[in-house]
Design a protein with these regions (language model features):
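Cell-envelope/extracellular polymer assembly enzymes that use nucleotide-activated donors
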Residues: 2-4, 172
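Short, well-formed alpha-helical segments that are part of the catalytic scaffolds
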Residues: 9-25
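Short beta-strand/loop segment that forms part of the nucleotide-sugar
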Residues: 20, 28-37
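Conserved donor nucleotide-binding strand/loop of the catalytic core
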Residues: 29-32, 43-71
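A conserved acidic beta->alpha catalytic loop
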Residues: 35-43, 84
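Acceptor/aglycone-binding surface of glycosyltransferases and processive sugar-polymer synthases
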Residues: 57-59, 63-71, 76-79, 89-167, ...
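Short active-site alpha-helical segment characteristic of glycosyltransferases
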Residues: 87, 169-176
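Catalytic donor-sugar/metal-binding loop of nucleotide-sugar-dependent glycosyltransferases
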Residues: 140-141, 165, 175-192
């Protein structure tokens, strides 16, 4: 049972320098960077550390996920951010749960025993609201429908046919899993503060994308 970990980056030299030396290559069959056009030395640092890099032509997290999965083969795929928000030690925990028979496992930043050191009150409220909407309208059972740190069976990922280009791919994945009544196993964890770099999340822009997506998925996607 093989797993590829996709490390999604765009100008994350500070985080990559601190986080990636903590990631053990024996945790997964492959660990591959998908880079959206970094100009701060992220790509060079990744190669220096011995990682393969796929160059992303179009920007956006959703696009990066599909670029990576389309270019590779494995039984499971995992998406990881090296900006400091994702704990490296959670990588083997996610993989272990797939060995126990779970098709989808993700990290929750807002479960009962979770801690987010990075989210401000606007982000907390937004996460609660959109997670509530996903659970209410699509039958989900999530405590965090907006986190992208997850492992998913490749066959299932392909069946979801995601088309969201940006951060909204995280919510779209949860919605489409819920509509198919496929359970996600959540691991409660800690979200540390970001390490350097620029925050990619713009609350108003992302909020508008997520709202439109809920309407679109509710009306059109079966």
């Amino acid at each position: 049972m093989s797993t590829i970990v996709f490390v999604l980056t765009l100008d994350e030299i500070d985080g990559v320098s601190v986080i990636m030396p903590q990631v053990k290559k024996e945790w997964a069959e492959q660990i591959i960077f998908v880079d959206g056009g970094s100009t701060d030395g992220t790509v060079e640092k990744a190669k220096e550390l011995g990682f393969e890099v796929i160059h992303q032509k179009n920007k956006g997290e959703g696009n990066a996920c599909r670029i990576g999965t389309d270019a590779t083969q494995s039984d499971y795929v995992m998406f990881f951010s090296p900006d400091g928000n994702d704990l490296p030690e959670d990588i083997p925990k996610l993989i272990e749960k797939t060995k126990e028979g779970h098709d989808v496992v993700h990290i929750s930043r807002f479960g009962k025993n979770s801690v987010s050191e990075d989210a401000n009150w606007i982000e907390r409220f937004g996460n609660y609201m959109f997670t509530f909407l996903v659970n209410t309208f699509f039958g989900g059972n999530y405590t965090d429908a907006l986190n992208g740190f997850r492992i998913i069976k490749r066959e299932l990922w392909d069946e979801l046919k995601t088309d969201a280009q940006y951060l909204n791919v995280e919510q779209q994945t949860c919605i489409r899993l819920a509509k198919r009544k496929i359970p996600i196993y959540e691991i409660e964890s800690i979200e540390p503060n970001r390490i350097g770099g620029e925050r990619k999340m713009r609350p108003l822009t992302v909020g508008a994308q997520l709202s439109y997506q809920i309407i679109k998925e509710f009306i059109f996607w079966k």
